[in-house]
């Protein structure tokens, strides 16, 4: 079942925009941000090494983002600077469960956007929209070694529910990594947590 999220979500400094319809120009813009940030992103995101040219991001736009929006499997948004509209990164509400009214948020930022609070603002904007539409629980998973990524749910008031030990294979370092599970409930969001 589809979750009824808006095509745009605005906050003070960022705007989250549905990346559809997919265009090659948009794919090139996303690819350039990934390519500029490749060294940092590949440390944490397994898909980065498979992104070698703009066509790879176009495939994601068509077969991933657009298809997921249509089927309700996921809701990817481009994170843009509200004033300049420059691309900062991507945030995604995924693994939506109609039965449990839950979903997971995943995200990445380009290197030039890190350290300015953009992702914290984007997460808060997306969680606001999702909780208003009836979601009860949002989860964020972070690699325990990725301190910057783990700081985002911490700043957004998510509760660290636990650590999944050796739960994900890290192909860059050739080892299993631990993953933190962070969560926020609608009741906590309503209290302003």
Regions found by a protein language model. Give the residues of each.
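A short helix-loop-beta-strand connector motif used in the catalytic cores of GNAT acetyltransferases and
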Residues: 50-51, 62-77
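Generic, well-ordered alpha-helical segments
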Residues: 33, 53-57, 71
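Acyl-donor (CoA/ACP) binding surface of acyl/acetyltransferases
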Residues: 1-29, 33-40, 76-193
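Sparse recognition of residues in long alpha-helices and their boundaries
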Residues: 46, 57, 73-74, 169
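Conserved GNAT-fold acetyl-CoA-binding loop/helix
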Residues: 39-63
């Amino acid at each position: 079942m589809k979750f009824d999220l808006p095509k745009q979500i605005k906050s003070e400094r960022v705007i989250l925009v549905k990346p559809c319809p997919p265009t090659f120009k948009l794919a090139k813009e996303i690819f350039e941000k990934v390519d500029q940030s490749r060294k940092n992103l590949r440390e944490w995101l397994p898909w980065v090494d498979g992104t070698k040219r703009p066509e790879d991001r176009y495939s994601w736009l068509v077969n991933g983002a657009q298809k997921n929006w249509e089927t309700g499997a996921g809701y990817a948004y481009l994170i843009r600077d509200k004033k300049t509209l420059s691309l900062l990164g991507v945030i995604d509400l995924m693994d939506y469960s109609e039965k449990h009214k839950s979903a997971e948020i995943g995200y990445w930022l380009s290197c030039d956007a890190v350290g300015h609070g953009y992702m914290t603002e984007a997460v808060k904007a997306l969680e606001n929209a999702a909780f208003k539409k009836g979601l009860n629980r949002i989860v964020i998973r972070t690699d325990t070694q990725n301190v910057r990524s783990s700081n985002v749910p911490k700043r957004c008031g998510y509760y660290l529910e636990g650590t999944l030990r050796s739960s994900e294979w890290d192909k860059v370092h050739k080892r299993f990594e631990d993953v933190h599970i962070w969560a926020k409930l609608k009741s906590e969001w309503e209290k302003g947590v």
